[in-house]
Swiss-Prot record:
A single MF term (Gene Ontology): ribosomal small subunit binding
Similarity comment: family membership: Belongs to the RbfA family.
Coiled coil region boundaries: none
Bias (Polar residues): 123-142
Principal location class: cytoplasm
Pfam annotation, one family: RBFA
One term under GO cellular component: cytosol
GO biological process: maturation of SSU-rRNA
Residue spans crossing the bilayer: none
Keywords: Cytoplasm, Ribosome biogenesis
InterPro entries: KH_dom-like_a/b (IPR015946), RbfA (IPR000238), RbfA_dom_sf (IPR023799), Ribosome-bd_factorA_CS (IPR020053)
Name this protein carries in UniProt: Ribosome-binding factor A
Length: 142
């Protein structure tokens, strides 16, 4: 198996197992304050380091507490990953906040606002484009 494929496979397994551990394995209450989703996992070529990108739904204070809880549980996660994946040496786990979903939501909101403005301007323009009716009088010259 090519080294790149192995790294991808290990990353996919880490993502799956970490998701499972987030639901059933971690007892730290800080982790369960917000809705946590794993968005991506990057594993170094030597399988010694692992970056887990998470999206956390909630207020900024909740996000920071959840991230602290995840970092505190990283040793536990590393041990569990080593045991579950039967790796001689499990990678060091680091969590990173992924703000991609937030940014995407922000862009969608902006597009929606633009669409509403366009509709409003379209209504104003269509009213101004109405032909003005003038009364015409005909004068008979006799």
């Amino acid at each position: 198996m090519a080294p790149g494929r192995r790294v991808e496979r290990v990353a996919a397994l880490i993502r799956r197992e970490t998701s499972e551990l987030l639901i059933h394995g971690i007892r730290d209450e800080r982790v369960h304050q917000g809705m946590v989703s794993i968005t991506n996992v990057e594993v170094s070529g030597d399988l010694q380091h692992c970056k887990i990108f998470v999206s956390i739904y909630g207020e900024e204070i909740q996000r920071s507490e959840v991230l602290e809880g995840l970092e505190a549980a990283s040793g536990f996660l590393r041990g569990e990953l080593g045991r579950r994946l039967q790796m001689r040496r499990a990678p060091e786990v680091h969590f990173h906040l992924d703000r991609g979903i937030e940014k995407g939501t922000s862009v969608l909101n902006l597009l929606e606002q633009l669409e509403q403005q366009r509709e409003t301007l379209g209504e104003v323009q269509s009213e101004s484009d109405q032909p003005t009716t003038y009364e015409t009088t005909t004068v008979n010259k006799t």
